[in-house]
């Protein structure tokens, strides 16, 4: 059946900002879908609020609406663009929920849904409808009951018994779900789940804790052809959300009979739900002893697991699902990797392991115990010839300084406690248990992880015990260790531990070289090497290979450049850096240079099979990078676009004289080394805050006293402001040093940076591109939040409202720094304007997280321009090549973009609602997971749109709760008076009430939690508070923390800085004005 010709305008709904449960995988699927629809001749219209995505680049759609994903905006686009059909299955839960809301409100008249019809979405997502559908086709389900109120939930639990699992309908990443072991826990979980479900429906089920969990990635076409793309096995048993579980593909502990039962059931489920053109994810649980199989749930859309399955098999699920949605059948679609029909089920001759990445260190008070509600921020994937090789490679990919199965404890009781408790380090504690002689059966009783996986870890521990210096001369032993996934660095560490002999990773590598032990590279080809692979998608392995290996060296023909990616998503290093790597690949294609991509993140566009000419799915470690450089014999290496991950490799790469292109290592070193950089700034006569670098705890005290408080402290070489704090006095410094030295040593190698804190300063981000001769000031972004809040967490906008004189000085100083440093490529500079003077805060000679936003806002693709500059060292030529709309002008000695006639604002998105116990107050340590963009004709309207897009909508009437810290009260009174004049009522606790009363501002006094009832929490729970303003800090009393927790729990919109309140007032004053709904292409005309 050929493509449909009765539709022409297709609207694709994106997933919005990166949040827990919905990350870069939907940029990958959305980008693939946009490209596919466009190549088929359809007119593609996209709505997505996330500017850091590749899919929102204007060339991927005919009209790109970077707007909040609301039913109202979608309806307006349908009318304006004359939409024939909507594809909602590429935008995660966000897209499905949006179309369901529109359907319920009668807003989809005359528009067809592609990929999944309303009935299919309802049956798949509504737990009651799903249960009825499963019973109809004879599927076994966990015993359960539905409830729509707290009373019904209590009736259900009396029937189900404890422990019980509570699940909410139409939620993302297990939102609102949990396991209750007693009635008190149950009542709280049931209330939370009812609140989380947009249709107030929850399912109370019998516990399946300890059962084995599997996922099937299924595709079905309009002719009822069905295929299994991949069967994914969860190592962690039921009770841990699959997004937080370590998973493997293909499944290793299923019998063929069980697999066939699951396969048949998956096909029957898709038919009954009504998914007739696209992909779905179906989850099962199997009792480890009785082998009873039950259906858990299904997603009638492309999911996080679909991205993993695509990368694990090389099968482009999103592309195939898109083609099926517009009329093709599986046998009409070609697999791009092998040129065989897409109806062939993929076959794997390797093992894939996925491990999630968490960020508990960023959120004090959040439990690291894993459960049915997802908590991970990102994930890594590794491919190996056997399970242990893949597992150890995955551990090495996590970017948390693990070289393999690191030992965490020798206390057996503490180890057992950690094995019982699902947590991100559980596998490492299991290895520790085996080191202390605990048996496989004993460990199984503690964690219910399948004995096969436990015996594999035990095997690895036994192999570790035998590592000594003799392996450096014994080819059989050393090859055996490499076959088990041991890195050179881990082998060196174990030799030191076992023999107390200092051996470096380089010496292990040298021994391998002498013994002719090197990895061979294999292809991910979807067909276990049965057909010729046309796209190089590679992984390394030391596993014995019966087939002739691809080899360790490539024939040198065309020019090649290696792009080192950013690894797993985590706070401080997210999708923005992957965006830059993808653009580097596109720019190399424009230069007719072959691109070689290295990354280990299965969610991203950079690891899609057709983004680069060659893809290596490997840990971003020096050992792996070196083997790829030797194999590919690249002409250049880009380390500047993947954040801190590749930058950390620059020193070792420079030592081996690897061909780093762009800004050289010596420049990176000057910018990263505080002492060298301070000297550099003094030579250029550029102001910076008073500072010092403490190489010991004693020196930290003396520097702090010399500078004077308040100070801001941070360790060197960190991203995302980790361990960064503002300290007001010597007591706070003492407490900080006592806490930080538990995890970080302060030494000459790892000094502590101490700066004078510029209170109430206006911060700015500048992105620039330099070719050693000329400079392009790509944008000056003004922060809304004042100094002291991490730049990644602050809202920022362009054009700036600062005076022309200050802006001229920023341009002049930026150009001076870029030219004198010798930057070739991108440069990010952070400034602060304090008491009308310009201070330099820091310089990063690499891509920054603001590059995608500025590229969208101003219409110049900065990462592409920078890549071209790094290759050709000609800024003028690069700007001319990419400035298609004549945006760039030359003025006052620098290139710069013409300022737009609109305001573009970037706002951060936080995971507080997913991480119970986290505090919403911001500081110098970054906490946001994603971003949204608001574009409008004024700052107020842009802010209004951005708040809507990041789930913090501005209400234009109602009761506002206000709690202000003492030092802010005088300034706050003026702002609160304006809120009252706009028609709001204020309610405050005693201290703020007195300050407002003294200033003549009317407010209603409410009780704190500790003062009795009814108190402020009661007002929030009753839905009486429309917004909350809270500028207290982390040092505030427990009452204030409980109030902030209540704000999150009750979905109250909140603002935590006075500078944000000022822009909020602008938004409220302008909110009655209509702002025309425009596509990015219209703004950039």
Swiss-Prot record:
- In this chain the ATP-grasp domain maps to 131-326, 678-871
InterPro entries for this protein: ATP-grasp, ATP_grasp_subdomain_1, CarbamoylP_synth_lsu, CarbamoylP_synth_lsu_oligo, CarbamoylP_synth_lsu_oligo_sf, CbamoylP_synth_lsu-like_ATP-bd, CbamoylP_synth_lsu_CPSase_dom, MGS-like_dom
Q: Which cofactor does it need?
A: Mg(2+); Mn(2+)
Binding locations of Mg(2+) 3: 830, 842
Biological process, per Gene Ontology: 'de novo' UMP biosynthetic process; glutamine metabolic process; L-arginine biosynthetic process
EC code: 6.3.4.16, 6.3.5.5
- Share what the entry says about its subunit structure, partners included: Composed of two chains; the small (or glutamine) chain promotes the hydrolysis of glutamine to ammonia, which is used by the large (or ammonia) chain to synthesize carbamoyl phosphate. Tetramer of heterodimers (alpha,beta)4.
Protein's UniProt name: Carbamoyl phosphate synthase large chain
């Amino acid at each position: 059946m050929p493509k449909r010709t009765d539709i022409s305008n297709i609207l694709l709904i994106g997933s919005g900002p990166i949040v827990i449960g919905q990350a870069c995988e939907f940029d990958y699927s959305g980008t693939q879908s946009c490209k596919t629809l466009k190549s088929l001749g359809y007119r593609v219209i996209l709505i997505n609020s996330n500017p850091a995505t590749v899919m929102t680049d204007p060339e991927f759609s005919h009209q790109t609406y970077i707007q909040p994903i609301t039913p109202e905006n979608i309806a307006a686009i349908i009318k304006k663009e004359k939409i024939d059909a909507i594809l909602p299955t590429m935008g995660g839960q966000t897209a499905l929920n949006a179309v369901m809301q529109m359907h319920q409100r009668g807003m989809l008249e005359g528009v067809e849904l592609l990929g999944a019809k309303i009935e299919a979405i309802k049956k798949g997502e509504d737990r009651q409808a799903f249960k009825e559908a499963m019973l109809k086709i004879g599927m076994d389900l966990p015993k359960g009951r539905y409830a729509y109120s707290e009373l019904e939930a209590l009736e259900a639990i009396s029937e189900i018994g404890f422990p019980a699992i509570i699940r909410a309908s139409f939620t993302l990443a297990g939102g609102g779900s949990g396991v209750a072991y007693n009635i008190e826990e149950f009542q709280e979980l049931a209330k939370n789940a009812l609140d989380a479900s947009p249709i107030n429906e929850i399912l109370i089920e019998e516990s399946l804790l300890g059962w084995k969990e599997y996922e099937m990635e299924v595709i079905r076409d309009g002719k009822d052809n069905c295929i299994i793309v991949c069967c994914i096995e969860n190592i962690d048993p039921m009770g841990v959300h699959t997004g937080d579980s370590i998973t493997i593909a293909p499944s290793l502990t299923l019998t063929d009979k069980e697999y066939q039962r699951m396969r048949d059931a998956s096909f029957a489920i898709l038919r009954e739900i009504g998914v007739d053109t696209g992909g779905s994810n179906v989850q099962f649980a199997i009792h480890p002893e009785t082998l009873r199989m039950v259906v858990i749930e299904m997603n009638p859309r492309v999911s996080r697991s679909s991205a993993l399955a695509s990368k694990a098999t090389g099968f482009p699920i999103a592309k195939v699902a898109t083609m099926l949605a517009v009329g093709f059948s599986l046998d009409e679609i070609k697999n791009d990797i092998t040129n065989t029909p897409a109806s062939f089920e993929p076959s794997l001759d390797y093992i894939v392991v996925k491990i999630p990445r968490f960020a508990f260190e960023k959120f004090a008070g959040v439990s690291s115990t894993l459960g049915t509600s997802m908590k991970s921020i990102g994930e890594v994937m590794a491919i190996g010839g056997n399970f242990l090789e893949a597992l150890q490679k995955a551990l090495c990919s996590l970017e948390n300084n693990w070289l393999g199965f690191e030992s965490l404890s020798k206390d057996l009781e503490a180890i057992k406690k950690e094995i019982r408790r699902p947590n991100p380090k559980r596998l490492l504690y299991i290895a520790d248990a085996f080191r202390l002689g605990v048996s496989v059966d004993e460990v199984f009783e503690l964690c219910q992880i399948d004995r096969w996986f436990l015996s594999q870890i035990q095997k690895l521990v036994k192999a570790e015990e035998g590592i000594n210096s003799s392996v450096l001369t014994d080819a059989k032993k050393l090859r055996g260790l490499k076959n088990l996934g041991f890195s050179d660095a881990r082998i060196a560490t174990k030799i030191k531990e076992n023999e107390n002999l200092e051996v470096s990773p380089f010496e292990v590598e040298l021994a391998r070289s002498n013994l002719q032990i090197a990895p061979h590279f294999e292809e991910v080809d979807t067909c276990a090497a049965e057909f010729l692979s046309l796209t190089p998608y590679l992984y390394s392995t030391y596993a014995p290979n019966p087939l002739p290996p691809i080899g360790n060296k490539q024939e040198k023909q065309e020019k090649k450049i290696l792009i080192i990616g950013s690894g797993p998503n985590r706070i401080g290093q997210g999708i923005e850096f992957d965006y830059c790597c993808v653009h580097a690949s596109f720019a190399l294609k424009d230069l007719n240079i072959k691109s070689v991509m290295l990354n280990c993140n299965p969610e991203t566009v950079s690891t899609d099979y057709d983004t680069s000419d060659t893809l290596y799915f490997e840990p971003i470690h020096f050992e792996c990078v070196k083997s790829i450089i030797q194999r590919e014999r690249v002409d250049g290496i880009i380390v500047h676009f993947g954040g801190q991950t590749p930058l950390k490799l620059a020193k070792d790469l420079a030592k081996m004289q690897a061909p780093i292109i762009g800004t050289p290592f010596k420049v990176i070193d000057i910018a990263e080394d505080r002492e060298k950089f301070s000297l550099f700034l003094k030579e250029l006569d550029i102001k910076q805050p008073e500072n010092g670098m403490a190489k010991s705890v004693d020196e930290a005290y003396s520097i702090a006293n010399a500078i004077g408080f308040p100070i801001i402290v941070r360790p060197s070489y960190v991203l995302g402001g980790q361990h960064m704090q503002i300290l007001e006095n010597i007591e706070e410094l003492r407490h900080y040093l006592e806490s930080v030295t538990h995890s970080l040593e302060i030494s000459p190698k790892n000094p502590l940076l101490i700066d004078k804190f510029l209170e109430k300063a206006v911060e700015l981000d500048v992105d620039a591109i330099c070719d050693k001769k000329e400079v392009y000031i790509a944008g000056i972004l003004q922060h809304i939040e004042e100094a002291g809040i991490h730049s990644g967490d602050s809202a920022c906008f362009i054009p700036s409202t600062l005076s022309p004189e200050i802006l001229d000085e920023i341009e002049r100083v930026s150009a001076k720094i870029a030219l004198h440093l010798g930057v070739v490529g991108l440069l990010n500079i952070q400034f602060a304007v304090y008491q009308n003077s310009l201070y330099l805060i820091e310089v990063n000679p690499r891509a920054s997280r603001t590059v995608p936003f500025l590229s969208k806002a101003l219409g110049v693709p900065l990462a592409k321009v920078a890549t071209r500059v790094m290759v050709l060292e000609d800024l003028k030529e690069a700007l001319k090549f990419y400035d298609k709309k004549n945006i760039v002008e030359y003025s006052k000695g620098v290139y710069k973009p013409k300022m737009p006639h609109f305001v573009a604002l970037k706002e951060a998105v936080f995971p507080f609602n997913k991480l119970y116990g986290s505090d919403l107050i911001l500081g110098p340590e970054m906490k946001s997971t994603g971003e949204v963009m608001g574009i409008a004709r004024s700052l107020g309207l842009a802010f209004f749109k951005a708040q809507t897009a990041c789930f913090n909508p501005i209400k234009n009437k109602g009761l506002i709760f206000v709690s202000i810290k003492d030092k802010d009260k005088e300034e706050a009174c003026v702002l609160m008076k304006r809120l009252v004049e706009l028609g709001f009522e204020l309610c405050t606790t005693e201290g703020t009430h007195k300050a407002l009363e003294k200033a003549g501002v009317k407010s209603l006094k409410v009780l704190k939690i500790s003062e009795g009832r009814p108190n402020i929490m009661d007002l929030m729970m009753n839905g009486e508070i429309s917004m909350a303003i809270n500028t207290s800090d982390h040092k505030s009393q427990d009452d204030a923390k409980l109030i902030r927790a209540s704000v999150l729990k009750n979905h109250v919109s909140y603002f935590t800085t006075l500078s944000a309140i000022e822009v909020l007032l602008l938004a409220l004053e302008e909110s009655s004005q209509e702002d025309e709904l425009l596509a990015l292409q219209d703004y950039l005309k």
